């Protein structure tokens, strides 16, 4: 049991001490490593995640090969005519007025010439 308790911290600290065990990510077409700082004889070619630099050995000419090729369009035949659709937007609007506005208009002479009937309230 004591041996297990001693081995566990060693396995946890081992990746931080030995770079080969740290699981550094490969970058730049698998020819470089993501590190905080590049070693002597390495050049920074790109940036990796977590603000790390992609360190590539500087004595070789490394060119990154694109991993994907352009995808051709399925309907890209020469001479095809594209349909153009024009949509015109129309706005429908309504005027809202109250009875008070109608009374004021009729008094000003702009509305109809009929007067409103008198209303008598009985109690």
Swiss-Prot record:
Which InterPro entries does the annotation name? Beta-defensin, Beta_defensin_dom
S-S bridge residues: 27-54, 34-48, 38-55
One Pfam family linked to the record: Defensin_beta_2
* Subcellular location(s) of the protein: Secreted
A Gene Ontology CC term for this entry?
extracellular region
Q: Name one GO molecular function term.
A: lipopolysaccharide binding
- Which stretches of sequence are listed as region Disordered? 59-79, 102-123
The source's superkingdom equals Eukaryota
Q: What PTM annotation applies here?
A: The three-dimensional structure formed by the three intramolecular disulfide bridges is indispensable for antimicrobial activity.
Alphabetical UniProt keywords? Antibiotic, Antimicrobial, Cleavage on pair of basic residues, Defensin, Disulfide bond, Secreted, Signal
The processes (GO biological process) annotated in the record are: defense response to Gram-negative bacterium; defense response to Gram-positive bacterium; innate immune response; killing of cells of another organism; negative regulation of cell adhesion; negative regulation of lipopolysaccharide-mediated signaling pathway
Record carries keyword DNA damage: no
Give the record's family classification: Belongs to the beta-defensin family.
Function, in words: Host defense peptide that exhibits antimicrobial activity against both Gram-negative bacteria, such as E.coli and S.typhimurium, and Gram-positive bacteria, such as S.aureus and B.subtilis. Inhibits cell adhesion of E.coli on intestinal epithelial enterocytes. Causes rapid permeabilization of both the outer and inner membrane of E.coli, leading to morphological alterations on the bacterial surface. Binds to bacterial lipopolysaccharides (LPS) with high affinity, and may thereby be involved in immunoregulation through LPS neutralization.
Know the name of this protein?
A: Defensin beta 118
């Amino acid at each position: 049991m004591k041996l297990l308790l001693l081995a566990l911290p060693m396995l946890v600290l081992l990746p931080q001490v030995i770079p080969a065990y740290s699981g550094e990510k490969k970058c730049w077409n698998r020819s470089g490593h993501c590190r905080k700082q590049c070693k002597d004889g390495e050049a920074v070619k790109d940036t990796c995640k977590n603000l790390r630099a992609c360190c590539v050995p500087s004595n070789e000419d490394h060119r990154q090969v694109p991993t994907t090729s352009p995808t051709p369009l399925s309907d890209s035949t020469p001479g095809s005519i594209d349909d153009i659709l024009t949509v015109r937007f129309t706005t429908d609007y309504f005027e809202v007025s109250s009875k008070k506005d109608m009374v004021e208009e009729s008094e000003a002479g702009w509305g109809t010439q009929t007067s409103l009937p008198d209303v008598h309230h009985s109690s």
